[in-house]
Amino acid sequence: MSRVYNFSAGPAVLPEEVLKEAADEMMDYKGTGMSVMEMSHRSKAYETIINEAEADLRDLLSIPDNYKVLFLQGGASQQFAMVPMNLFQNGVGDYIITGQWAKKAYQEAKLYGTANAVASSADKTFSYIPDVSDLPISEDADYVYICENNTIYGTKYKTLPDTKGKILVADLSSCFLSEPVDVSKYGLIFAGAQKNVGPAGVVIVIIREDLIREDVLKETPTMLRYKTHADAKSLYNTPPAYGIYICGKVFKWLKNLGGLEAMKKINEKKAAILYDFLDQSKMFRGTVVEKDRSLMNVPFVTGDEELDALFVKESKAAGFENLKGHRSVGGMRASIYNAMPLEGVEKLVSFMRDFEEKHTAQAD
């Protein structure tokens, strides 16, 4: 069976080179006589895997020496609790609400202290990024929190907020490693792996060392303390070992491609092909303010729910999977992460053009 073009928002498409390498090593990883799935996380072989993964990630992002890299479990959603549990000193966090995931993080923070919504784009169904140049940042805020790329709604910050000296915390799950990032502008970054760098089950945290504290909220469980994992180099307990191994292979794939500058150019080209078609189409239209469009997640609609459903059905039959929009918004969404080949986007646009011609002719 031939592989489909998988436009899933996550778990998502992975580089074929990585999958083939993993398949070749499945039964015998580099002469160990066992799979990485079977390997002790305390073994020398696995120590090399996790150390190389961290080193390659540091190289890709030019992560400063005063930041720790953690490979954790619990997904990005667990970070919604870990962030306030570990960073609250005054018990106050300022949140910019640009979609469901930022909203969920905001609601979770309320369980542990005060969460302030200092800006929101909910008034227009999260179809834009609010002005973040002069936010009413709370004087006692411990941090300012953003979700930098909004998977469901297809928006992306092009300018980071002026936090007025407060720590910036960012969920980068659906744009992680899609382009260069200046890590030094953030106090803490986290990203679920299953969108752009690996399988579900791994969350990557990049945290400035001074934010790894002993004096966290007293009810914080041992496993939810960043210090626990930083001190143990992500090996306090059994990590998601195979997932980290795949992430490591993706990091090497990105380096071989030329790094994040090269990846950004490819992503911009893919996104332009799809957005250019949407802008000239008479049937399909994008749902996001143009200046805030994501390179990774492209939502679109026809304006007719029945026609949307027909498009999803016919596209699936043609080998394009997971184009149905999120259940909360409907329509369609093409997630064109790093591993989606240019050819996949070109073929999708060709299919969309044919669909439009066919159904416009039928309507006439």
Which residues does each PLM region occupy?
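Conserved active-site segment immediately N-terminal to the catalytic lysine
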Residues: 169, 183-194, 203
